[in-house]
Structures are given as C-alpha cells and as structure tokens.
From Swiss-Prot:
It comes from Trichlorobacter lovleyi (strain ATCC BAA-1151 / DSM 17278 / SZ). The lineage of its organism: Bacteria, Pseudomonadati, Thermodesulfobacteriota, Desulfuromonadia, Geobacterales. The keyword Transit peptide does not apply. GO terms for cellular component: cytosol. Activates KDO (a required 8-carbon sugar) for incorporation into bacterial lipopolysaccharide in Gram-negative bacteria. Belongs to the KdsB family. Signal peptide: none annotated. Its main location: cytoplasm. This is 3-deoxy-manno-octulosonate cytidylyltransferase. Its EC number is 2.7.7.38. It is an enzyme of class 2 (transferase). It catalyses: 3-deoxy-alpha-D-manno-oct-2-ulosonate + CTP = CMP-3-deoxy-beta-D-manno-octulosonate + diphosphate. Pathway: Nucleotide-sugar biosynthesis; CMP-3-deoxy-D-manno-octulosonate biosynthesis; CMP-3-deoxy-D-manno-octulosonate from 3-deoxy-D-manno-octulosonate and CTP: step 1/1; Bacterial outer membrane biogenesis; lipopolysaccharide biosynthesis. GO terms for molecular function: 3-deoxy-manno-octulosonate cytidylyltransferase activity. It is found in: Cytoplasm.
Length: 252
C-alpha cells in the first residue's frame, strides 16, 4: 500500500505571515514538520505542497520533496487534491504545515484503521480536553463520536453540552476525566480517490457556518473514523504560539 503524506504550506498566513519559515530551534518551522512526518513508519513518501518558492527551496535544500501549487486555492484540501491528482498512491495523509511538534506516532495512529479496511474513506484524530478554557474556546474544535469511533459532529461550540453538570465546569473536572470531552486534532487521512471526490463537492451549510471543512464530508453521508491519541501537538497560528513551541522543545 502506497501511503503519501502531503504537507500544505502557505507563506501568506493571515495571523502570522511567513510562519512556515519562522525560526524554531535553528530550523524553519516547515522543516520540523517535514522531518517529523518522514519519521512515521507507515508513510512511504512525504511532500510539501506550497505556493511559495522560498518554502520549496528550504525543503529541497535538505533533500526533501516539495511541489509548487496554484496560488488560487481557497482551502488546504484544494491544495492537497491538486498534488494528489498526480500521485500513484492509495492513501493520502494531510499533515498540517503549522504542527512542528507532531509526533510520528500520531500519524501512524491515524493511518492504522485504513490497513486492511478498503471501505474506509476518511479518518482523523481526537484527544482529551483537559481544561475549561479549551472546552469553551471557539478556536478549539470539539468532536463527538459514536460507539464505533465514527464522528457524529464537530463544532466550535462546547460539545457535548453537560446540561446537568454545568455547575461542575472546572479545570479539575476535565483534567480528572469526570467530564469527558474530546478536541479534534487536525490531521486527516483519505483514500486518494475519495479525496478527489471530496475536494470537488460544493461547500455545505454546516461547513460554512462553523468554518470546518470536515463537516462537508459528514453532510454528504461520509463516515469519518476518529482515533483517540494521547500525544499532544501544538498548532502555531501566532508568534505567541511559536514561543510556546520553543519552550516545549527546550523541555524536551
């Protein structure tokens, strides 16, 4: 089975322009993401997909693979699909270009349900919410799943709504697991052929309402397998996030 990881990376981030090339422990951030990705044992090949020559040059200089893509894509999925069309691959893994601390084991965990399961079209990860701030924050996407580990819904709202335990909404309740809630970890795995279909689907009501692309799949009746991970990554959306990543790396 040919499994290719694609890392979409733009230079023109709204909140943090140039973040893909921001220095993190002596390396551009995108280099950290690429190096962590190729360490995943189930990944056959890793490619950075970018619309900026500077990002491609960084990857080429370390002997990696980067492909220049159109500057007109509205979403990361569109950029992913452009590259996937030209690949001879069975499975495509979408690794976010702003996750320099991603553990290779997380990538393997997301891929594993696809091994020997040709009917599975899309998968992702979740991890425990451990504080009240994350539960309430619209910037932390929550997910609920059925008893078989398939997504029921993703939302920026508190999910689930603990109607009879609202007075118990404290950090300790989440940290101890007394209130069990999960946040979405934005790493996706697709059957290649399904990815191309998915990218061509019109945007949907819930997707546009929540600004969450994965809802397009749910609204079209596609089951999304969600695997729980205990590994903690860190998305870098702002300079402050970059400083947090630097501190995490110092701590080992």
């Amino acid at each position: 089975m040919q499994i290719v990881a694609i890392i979409p990376a733009r230079y023109g981030s709204t909140r943090f322009p140039g973040k893909a090339l921001a220095d993190l422990a002596g390396k551009p951030m995108i280099q950290h993401v690429y190096e962590q990705t190729i360490r995943a044992s189930l990944v056959s090949r890793a490619i950075v997909a970018t619309d900026d020559r500077r990002i491609a040059d960084v990857i080429h200089q370390i002997g990696g693979e980067a492909i220049m893509t159109s500057t007109d894509h509205e979403t990361g999925t569109d950029r992913l699909a452009e590259v996937a069309r030209g690949l001879d691959a069975d499975i495509i893994v979408n690794v976010q270009g702003d996750e320099p601390l991603i553990d290779p084991a997380m990538i393997n965990q997301a891929i594993e349900p696809f091994l020997g399961n040709p009917g599975l079209k899309m998968g992702t990860l979740k991890s425990r919410v451990k504080c009240l701030h994350d539960f309430l924050s619209p910037n932390v996407v929550k997910v609920v799943t059925d008893n078989n580990g398939y997504a029921l819904y993703f939302s920026r709202s508190p999910l689930p709504f603990f109607r009879d335990k609202w007075q118990d909404l404290k950090d300790e309740a989440f940290a101890s697991g007394r209130l069990l809630c999960f946040k979405h970890v934005g790493l996706y795995v697709y059957q290649r052929n399904f990815l191309l279909e998915y990218a061509a689907m019109p945007q949907t009501f819930l997707e546009l309402s929540e600004k969450l692309e994965q809802l397009r799949a749910l609204e079209n009746g596609i089951r999304i397998r969600v695997v729980e991970t205990e590994f903690e990554s860190l998305g870098v959306d702002t300079p402050d996030d970059l400083n947090k990543a630097k501190e995490r790396m110092k701590q080992g």
